Structure formats: C-alpha cells, structure tokens
Amino acid sequence: MKLEKLPEEFVQAKPVLEKIIEHGFEAYFVGGSVRDILLGREIHDVDIATSAYPEEIKDIFPYTIDVGIEHGTVLVLAGKSEAEHYEITTFRTESKYTDYRRPDHVDFVRDLREDLKRRDFTINAFACDVNGQIIDLFDGLTDLKERRLTAVGSALERFNEDALRIMRAMRFAATLDFQIENKTFLAMCESAHLLEKISVERIFIEFDKLLLGQDWRNGLTLLLKSGAYKYLPDLQDSALKKVLTDLSVDFHFQNSEQAWAALLTRFSNVDVKTFLRKWKVSNEFAKFVADLVSAYELDSWDLMSLYHFGLEKVLLVDELKVAYGLKINREQAVTINNQLQIHDKSEIVIAGKDLMEEFSLEPGPELGKILKIIEEKIVKNELKNEQAAIFAEVKKML
C-alpha cells in the first residue's frame, strides 16, 4: 500500500533520506512511527534505517554524533533545532542474547529484510520509503487491520532474545487495544520467568505505560493470565484482580501516581514506600503515591488534610474513590481549599529568624515547636497570617 500523504514529520526528514539515496544507498522510515501513521496516531520519534554503514553516513553528512555507533546508530544534525536531528541506524542482524536483554554483537548488512526480521512484532516491522510506499514483509498490515499483535518469526526466539518484549506486548495491548495472537501469547507464558533477568527500571516503564493505556484492563488481564506478574516485584494477584473487579469499567487513570495508588489501595499488608523502593522509582514519585494512598484512607477532608496533601492530590483521590464506588462530596475539597490562608509553609509571613530577633530566642527545639504551633493555627484559621497577630500569639506562649 501507499500513503496518500506523508505526515509532516516525514516530509521534514525526507531530504535526509534523499541525500542517502543520492549516494547510492537505501533509506527508509521504520518502526513505531510507520505503525502510528497507519493507525492515525500521533508520531513521537522518526526512526530511519539505511543500507549505509555508520562511517558512510558520517561521510555523507557534515554534522553527526556517534550516539550508538557500535550498534550502527549515528545522530545526523540536519538543522539547528532538535526536531531536525535524526537517528540513522544501519540495517543489521543480531547474534545471541545471552543476557536476555541485548545482543552479544551486531553485524551490519545491506538487506532490509534481514533488518526487519529481527524486530519484535509484525506491526513494528514496517518500512516506508520517501514516496510513502509501505513495505510489509511479515503481513503486519493484516495484523494491524485485525488489531492483533503477532511476533515476527518465532515468538519464543523473540522473547528469549529480549524478555522485555513480553511486557511490551501487554503494553501495546493496553495502549492500542490489540489482542495477542495465540502462539505469541503461549510463548509469552512460557518465557515469562525470563523477566527476572530484566532490570526493574525497564519493566517499570512498560508497566507504567500499560496502566496509562486506554485499555489498561486488557493489559492487566494479560499480565494475570500469562503469569508474568509473578516475576515482577511484590505484585499480588489478588490485588490485581480487585483492581479489575472493583474499579468502574470506564475509568482511566489521570497520571502514573494515581494508577499506582489505585493498585496499592487493593494490596493487603503493604508498606507503600518499601514496595516502591523495590521498583526503584524516584523518591519524589514514591512520596506522591504514598500520599495518595494515605489520603485515600481518610473518610473526609478538613483544613489540615487539604494543607498537608494539597488540592491536586486530594482531587486525584476523590476521583479514585468515586471510581471504586465510594460516595463523596465532590465540592468539599475545593470549598475547604478556598478557606486556607496558606498552602505552603513558605507563605507564612514570618520565619524563625523574625521570632529570634523579636523575642531573643535561640535556634533549637523550642523555636521549632513554636513555629509548628503557629503554622497549625494559621492552617486551622485560628490565627491570622499577619506579623502582628503572630507576634501576639507567640508572646502568649512565652
């Protein structure tokens, strides 16, 4: 098939491909960008594959950066903006994956078929030439039409090469609303234990995208059916099942933190921060999720809880509670938030140094205690956030 019109991202990159072709080599748009065009989705990255070897690409273009030259990838700086920087990768074949993550070595080749047949799924194995002609060597167009995910060649080999492809399959099922072809799914089940060989950081990225997918239920169901969850840090099948049964069927997560909090509210006897530490997330992410889980356990909001958690988190929790079938007062959080004089400690008009100067106080626990009391009284609207009022209140304490 041929595209009626090249997308703007391809039009912008077209001169790069044409220059490679002028020098006697082949060059194509490949991978996820071609798939997304065919699905009518937004393109994120433009990937270019070529029969030219890395050194030949560097001879063609004056400005390049070696970003992964050992794997055949050179960054071509076709313009000043980052949007005009393109990763160009030589056609290649790959050796065995002894670590189930990356090939021991790659061999550069001139044949497009050899390059495409090493890819994970047929819907990711398309190539598109400068005129918009789609090259489909593995019947990916049929799979695309039938919304089916099929491994290229032997599914077992593909998953043994890189076990992360098991998570990618479930992520694609969730984000694209695809079903997984039977042989491919059976190979996923057989290879699921290999996920233990994959870094938890890489698994987190795929699982996180799965949860944010429009059909995350499909992805989560596949995670359970395949048994892959057993090889991910501390996932409880009972909790995953509760998420599927308890959340309203049309609910979609607003962000990653809300999605992970939704999971953790269904867990039994879990320390949120310990759990997330095993997933090696950032401290900031872990705190956000832990706050959501803590806030979820509250029956109602008051000034202190709004101040402590903040309106953003409270509204995310309210959404979650509604999705889990709990009755809440949707207006309560906003109403209470509007009653707060301050939303952060930094908004208090005085600081510790002001009290030290005014009352000849020394730094230490006593000063800290006074500041804490002042903060709480302001939050509860028992004290105005004004210097004179605060000084008068402190005077009473001393």
Swiss-Prot record:
E.C. no: 2.7.7.72
Keywords of this entry: ATP-binding, Magnesium, Metal-binding, Nucleotide-binding, Nucleotidyltransferase, RNA repair, RNA-binding, Transferase, tRNA processing
Keyword Transcription part of the UniProt annotation: no
Catalytic activity: a tRNA precursor + 2 CTP + ATP = a tRNA with a 3' CCA end + 3 diphosphate; a tRNA with a 3' CCA end + 2 CTP + ATP = a tRNA with a 3' CCACCA end + 3 diphosphate
Molecular function GO terms recorded: ATP binding; CCA tRNA nucleotidyltransferase activity; magnesium ion binding; tRNA binding
Known cofactor(s): Mg(2+)
Enzyme class per UniProt: transferase
Residues that coordinate or bind ATP: G32, R35, R119, D162, R165, R168, R171
Taxonomy, superkingdom: Bacteria
Residues involved in CTP binding: G32, R35, R119, D162, R165, R168, R171
InterPro entries, alphabetized: Bact_CCA-adding_enz_type3_sf, CCA-adding_enz_C, CCA-adding_enz_firmicutes, NT_sf, PolA_pol_head_dom, PolyA_RNA-bd
SUPFAM superfamilies: Nucleotidyltransferase, Poly A polymerase C-terminal region-like
Signal peptide annotation: none
Residues at which Mg(2+) binds: D45, D47
CDD domains, alphabetized: NT_ClassII-CCAase
Alphabetical GO biological process terms: RNA repair; tRNA 3'-terminal CCA addition
Family recorded in the similarity comment: Belongs to the tRNA nucleotidyltransferase/poly(A) polymerase family. Bacterial CCA-adding enzyme type 3 subfamily.
NCBIfam families, sorted: PRK13299.1 (NF009814)
Subunit description: Homodimer.
Job description of the protein: Catalyzes the addition and repair of the essential 3'-terminal CCA sequence in tRNAs without using a nucleic acid template. Adds these three nucleotides in the order of C, C, and A to the tRNA nucleotide-73, using CTP and ATP as substrates and producing inorganic pyrophosphate. tRNA 3'-terminal CCA addition is required both for tRNA processing and repair. Also involved in tRNA surveillance by mediating tandem CCA addition to generate a CCACCA at the 3' terminus of unstable tRNAs. While stable tRNAs receive only 3'-terminal CCA, unstable tRNAs are marked with CCACCA and rapidly degraded.
Other information: A single active site specifically recognizes both ATP and CTP and is responsible for their addition.
Entry protein name: CCA-adding enzyme
Annotated source species: Lactococcus lactis subsp. lactis (strain IL1403) (Streptococcus lactis)
Organism taxonomic ancestry: Bacteria, Bacillati, Bacillota, Bacilli, Lactobacillales
Gene (name only): cca
